[in-house]
Design a protein with these regions (language model features):
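Sec-dependent signal peptide recognition
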Residues: 2-10
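N-terminal signal peptide c-region/cleavage motif recognized by signal peptidases
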Residues: 14-16
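Active-site gating/metal-coordination segments in enzymes
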Residues: 21, 61-156, 205-206
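Divalent metal-dependent hydrolysis catalytic cores, especially in the metallo-beta-lactamase
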Residues: 26-29, 42-61, 77-82, 103-109
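Histidine-centered divalent metal-coordination motifs
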Residues: 30-34, 137, 178, 246
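Alpha-helical scaffolding segments of alpha/beta enzyme cores, especially the outer helices
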Residues: 42-45, 65-68, 92, 96, ...
Length: 305
């Protein structure tokens, strides 16, 4: 490792700690960035107004710009590495994102095998080693170019694929995007038994369920239930949710629209404001604090691997 690279790594490590000194009002766990020009400045304005933090899901294409911006605004952005599980150099990519101070990986999607296939276990081992949060796409997968052949299957990304991962790596924090759309009941049940598994309800779920938001009371049903058949907890079942906007392609209107839909659903379900505060920021803020305390110091020798 050259002296210049070592200096850069040490600088990134020194700036990777949480810069916020108070619990923000909003943490968006699901914001994509692929190098779109000018978008980061616009996102920053929205985050400043909301007293928010965004997990910036950064592709290799967007990495140079995002990494610089995150270092300049560590109180508003946390880096996530947008990796492809089937890339032959994926472990090296994880090392690179970790060395840059990124705190998680995702959105993981469009894999050639099911998420819980043993072929991907070395990737989860590496994430576990670095205490990185994993964000998985769950449920139906979009098809933006229907005229082109694609090796993509909804079945590989079913939310039930996260159950084995959550059990096998009990210290990994896992977020399932989209609440498994349309497999909501399965999502709720595996979330109920896996304390390290959370969900966002970004995407189309809160659009198609707009006329029946109370439906989610049947998914998150176990609040205050005393039974040997469900984990003992004083927490609201809705605390399995965290906020995600799923902004992509620079469509920033979705940042505001997603918040409005979340609030409408939670209000219809009579979720207390104290619990809503956890969903919008408190739960994830607590996780980030624990992650920072538990994470090993960055290995400046990993570049020699």
């Amino acid at each position: 490792m050259t002296r210049a690279w070592l200096t850069l790594v040490l600088f990134l490590v020194s700036t990777s700690a949480l810069a916020q000194t108070h619990t923000p009002r909003l943490i968006d766990v699901h914001m994509h960035y692929d190098g779109e020009p000018g978008i980061l400045d616009q996102v920053l304005v929205k985050l400043e107004a909301a007293d928010g933090i965004a997990f910036l899901l950064t592709t290799p294409k967007g990495f140079p710009q995002a990494n610089k911006f995150i270092q300049e605004h560590p109180d508003r952005f946390i880096g996530f590495g947008d990796i492809k599980l089937d890339d032959p150099d994926v472990l090296h990519q994880i090392d690179r994102f970790h060395a840059a101070g990124f705190r998680g990986l995702g959105e993981i999607t469009m894999t050639r095998k099911p998420y819980d296939d043993p072929a991907y276990w070395p990737i989860y081992d590496r994430a576990d080693k670095y205490h990185m949060i994993l964000l998985f796409h769950t449920g139906i997968v979009n098809r933006l170019h229907p005229q082109e052949p694609a090796d993509v299957s909804f079945d590989r990304s079913r939310v039930t694929r996260l159950d084995l991962i959550a059990r096998h790596w009990p210290n990994l924090i896992i977020i399932g995007a989209h609440l498994g759309n349309p497999d909501y009941e399965e999502a709720g049940e595996i979330g109920r038994w896996n304390p390290n598994l959370y969900f966002d309800v970004s995407g189309t779920t809160l659009i198609k369920k707009k006329a029946d938001y109370r439906f989610f009371q049947s998914i998150f049903w176990w609040t205050a239930v005393a039974s040997p058949h469900t984990p003992a907890s004083g927490a609201s079942a809705f605390e399995k949710l965290v906020f995600g906007s799923d902004v992509f392609g620079g469509e920033l209107d979705e940042f505001d629209s997603a918040q409005a839909r979340y609030h409408a659903m939670l209000d219809d379900c009579e979720v207390p404001q104290s619990v809503q505060a956890k969903i919008f920021s408190g739960t994830m803020w607590h996780i980030l604090q624990l992650q920072q305390a538990q994470a090993p110091s960055k290995d400046v020798n990993q570049g020699k691997q």
